[in-house]
Swiss-Prot record:
Chain segments annotated as coiled-coil in the UniProt record: none
Additional notes on this entry: CTPSs have evolved a hybrid strategy for distinguishing between UTP and CTP. The overlapping regions of the product feedback inhibitory and substrate sites recognize a common feature in both compounds, the triphosphate moiety. To differentiate isosteric substrate and product pyrimidine rings, an additional pocket far from the expected kinase/ligase catalytic site, specifically recognizes the cytosine and ribose portions of the product inhibitor.
Entries under PROSITE patterns matching the protein: GATASE_TYPE_1
Pathway: Pyrimidine metabolism; CTP biosynthesis via de novo pathway; CTP from UDP: step 2/2
Keywords: ATP-binding, Glutamine amidotransferase, Ligase, Magnesium, Metal-binding, Nucleotide-binding, Pyrimidine biosynthesis
Primary enzyme class: ligase
A GO term, aspect molecular function: metal ion binding
Domain Glutamine amidotransferase type-1: 291-541
GO biological process entries: 'de novo' CTP biosynthetic process; pyrimidine nucleobase biosynthetic process
Positions of region (Amidoligase domain): 1-265
Positions contributing to UTP binding: S13, K186, T187, K188, P189, T190, Q191, K222
Name of this chain's protein: CTP synthase
Activity regulation, short description: Allosterically activated by GTP, when glutamine is the substrate; GTP has no effect on the reaction when ammonia is the substrate. The allosteric effector GTP functions by stabilizing the protein conformation that binds the tetrahedral intermediate(s) formed during glutamine hydrolysis. Inhibited by the product CTP, via allosteric rather than competitive inhibition.
Amino acid sequence: MARYVFITGGVVSSLGKGIAAAALAALLQARGYRVRIRKLDPYLNVDPGTMSPYQHGEVFVTDDGAETDLDLGHYERFTGRPANQQDNITTGRIYRNIIEKERRGDYLGATVQVIPHVTDEIKNFVLEGNEDYDFVLCEIGGTVGDIEAMPFLEAIRQLGNELPRGTAVYIHLTLMPYIPAAGELKTKPTQHSVKELRSIGIAPDILLVRADREIPESERRKLSLFCNVRESAVIQALDVATIYDVPIAYHKEGLDSEVLSAFGIDPAPKPRMDRWEEVSHRLHNPEGEVTIAVVGKYTGLKDAYKSLIEALHHGGLANKVKVNLDWIEAEVFESEDPAPYLEKVHGILVPGGFGERGAEGKILAAKFARERKVPYFGICFGMQMACIEAARNLVGIEDASSSEFGPTREPVVGLMTEWLKGNMLEKRAAAGDLGGTMRLGAYEAVLKPDSKIAQIYGSTDIHERHRHRYEVNIDYKDRLEAAGLNFAGMSPDGVLPETVEYADHPWFIGVQYHPELKSRPFEPHPLFASFIEAAIEQSRLV
């Protein structure tokens, strides 16, 4: 039977509950356990698919097409286990499910209430489908005290009573701030956070305390006394250089041992930390470094590109180099010459995005990379802009544009109206809803055997995750290929372009999918490993 770990947060948001959950899962895996992680988000959106990147950060897409919280990306990267639709729930989805049941008459005329109907729906989500796992870690989004989080906290409180004794453990992640004027760390915020949690009926078994410096033993004893937890269960979570240092740091502090002890597992299997130690060693002992320009439109919030950032660092791990990122707002190039910004970098990456803002700047970045022979990686929107650049400057179609930006006489990029998903034909209309209407999830692509991208993959058949509503127009394929832009990958039915490349360029590849979503520290995605390898070669020329 599965054991459950519920992870809550207090004092402030953005403390790193997702990283903590992922790191603990990795530590339990290192001891040979089968682990699943689930995220419970209190917001009323059905999913984050239509939320602004500035509000929510990245939307992480799973193989089965779920648009989910970026924390699921951390879960996948740390554990290697692909997430799915059933690993993330929101208040919006819960209420939608309940309303659908009420309309069908499933509640037999009962008054539908938060307790028991909403809490039961949450509990069903937590408990469903866990037969093959030893541990299920549930991260509760938000902060203790938030109104939105109350039904979730009530649900996990009830589960603590309903699950067999010894199969539920509560971890509370808090902040212990340092006050310079006093010259000391303060325990009071954590005390109040635990008091709030206990007033709901949840007594934390373990405190995971974030701090920017070593927590004195006297302060740990104080937290133990006032928060009613064992002294050994007050675990300090100090700031570290990279997120991939977190599992090792938590292991040294005894988090995994304390969790197993709370479950009464003694003796516990010995952990194998060699893979994490190797990753940490490579990160802290690079044999060189490269600089990659990321030309985007959400550069003010790096969380909007979380998986992309990590995939680039994974490419650095594969090549034993440090990857420095030069963030450039694409709109800058619409009023300034790109050359001073891009001449000194070793690679240019144009990531995914939506809308017209910054598009011309991204087109200019693709033009610079093509003409100057700088490695270029265009992902989703970045591939589309590379095709528009080629249409304008190589084919001579001056009005080449995307129908996403408005009516155009030359829609080199256009709205997809239908595509195959397995054996089913998916259809969309331009006037349809935005939420959940994109081409989402893993789709197959077929690569030309003699293409550069097929050599990188070592295969001509690939499966990658997609999230897009627009696609390069197949009607322009012949003219673009005649100008030198090779359509190296297509959907199996030959209708949707998936990858493009220039044969006479050291490394210029555009992909319609999002390879960053499948990259792992232990298994860097081949495209990112190859891109960084090309950047290393470019660094010798600059």
